[in-house]
């Protein structure tokens, strides 16, 4: 009798272990646990071009002097003297969902649009509407843009959506989209798409693969960002600059840079001597080496964007950007308000085209 009880107990344990193993395998099928930022998938693109020999626009110094002053023209009175530069981690950034349409466990969703920005472009209808691989937990970033990206490892199709809203039946309705068709697993992405532009359309105004110029979670943990960074500018000048494909700036100030216009921090400055906050120093070093560009405007302040933490949080992990999260604690905060805009240098419009 004792042997029978022991056998039953053993079988119950074995069954539980098998069930847990199956759940783990299913979990892996739904959730991509790797990183697009380490190793960086856009190596060899314009995002990893070093800028030490970047030429300067004739009004570069004037732009640098204006950048710290610009937000005060748009901020509410209570923020004018205290807010200059922020970091978006869960709102107004672009979550990236890496999917695998070859995986039998991959979930899908239907996508529809009635917006003229989509329906009159045959390839956008072909590549960004219909049945698209997407995990059920997917959601857009908070804030008004409601954007997210879906990158399919199997096909190499990189889809991005703007103002995506899911109805009660699970169908996503969106206002704008963009795509680029890379090789499977995004092999040679930097070689095949040096400019990091969408083939057609876009989720951000510059119509680029903007999510890959966000600050990656893996990079922040590692302590080094190895690519250029995009930011949302308080306002931009009218027009746009390569590699952007369009812009929506409304500023008439001659020293408001254009969206897409490249900038850097003076390479002759020793950033370690500036007494910047640790996280600001991380960002400043990336901008000094690889540069950056304005990808959108917000009529508020200057805002860098970070990789959205949803893919980690759905696995039960804490938000690394929040107080108590590992990145926040590593840098003793992620405040970027001391970013040295006055030390930036700006390239001529369309530099590198």
Residue ranges and their predicted role:
Residues 18-20:
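Bacterial signal peptide processing site
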Residues 13-16:
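C-terminal motif of bacterial Sec signal peptides marking the signal peptidase cleavage site
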Residues 24-353:
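Short, surface-exposed polybasic-aromatic patches that bind anionic ligands, especially phosphate groups
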């Amino acid at each position: 009798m004792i042997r029978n009880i022991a056998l039953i107990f053993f079988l119950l344990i074995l069954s539980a272990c098998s069930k847990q193993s199956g759940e783990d395998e299913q979990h892996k099928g739904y959730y991509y646990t790797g990183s697009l930022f380490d190793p960086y998938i856009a190596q060899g693109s314009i995002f990893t071009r070093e800028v030490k020999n970047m030429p300067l626009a004739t009004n570069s110094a004037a732009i640098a002097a204006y950048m710290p002053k610009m937000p005060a023209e748009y901020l509410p009175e209570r923020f004018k003297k205290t807010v200059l530069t922020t970091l978006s981690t869960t709102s107004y950034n672009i979550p990236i969902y890496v999917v695998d349409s070859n995986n039998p466990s991959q979930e899908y969703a239907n996508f529809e649009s009635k917006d003229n920005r989509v329906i009159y472009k045959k390839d956008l209808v072909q590549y960004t509407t219909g049945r698209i691989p997407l995990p059920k937990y997917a959601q857009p970033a908070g804030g008004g843009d409601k954007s997210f990206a879906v990158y399919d490892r199997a096909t190499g199709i990189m889809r991005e959506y703007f103002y995506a809203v899911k109805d009660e039946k699970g169908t996503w309705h969106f206002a704008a989209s963009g795509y680029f068709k890379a090789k499977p697993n995004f092999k040679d992405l930097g070689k095949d798409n040096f400019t990091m532009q969408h083939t057609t359309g876009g989720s951000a105004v510059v119509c680029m693969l903007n999510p890959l110029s966000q600050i990656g979670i893996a990079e922040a943990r590692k302590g080094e960002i190895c690519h250029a960074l995009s930011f949302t500018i308080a306002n931009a000048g009218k027009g746009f600059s390569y590699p952007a494909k369009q812009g929506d700036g409304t500023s008439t100030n001659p020293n408001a840079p254009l969206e897409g216009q490249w900038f850097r921090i003076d390479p002759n400055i020793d950033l370690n001597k500036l007494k910047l906050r640790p996280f600001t120093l991380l960002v400043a070093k990336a901008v000094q080496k690889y540069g950056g560009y304005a990808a959108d405007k917000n009529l508020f302040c200057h805002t860098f964007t970070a990789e959205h933490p949803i893919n980690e949080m759905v696995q039960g992990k804490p938000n690394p950007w929040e107080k108590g999260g590992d990145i926040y604690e590593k840098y003793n905060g992620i405040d970027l308000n001391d970013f040295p805009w006055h030390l930036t240098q700006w390239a001529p419009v369309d530099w590198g085209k």
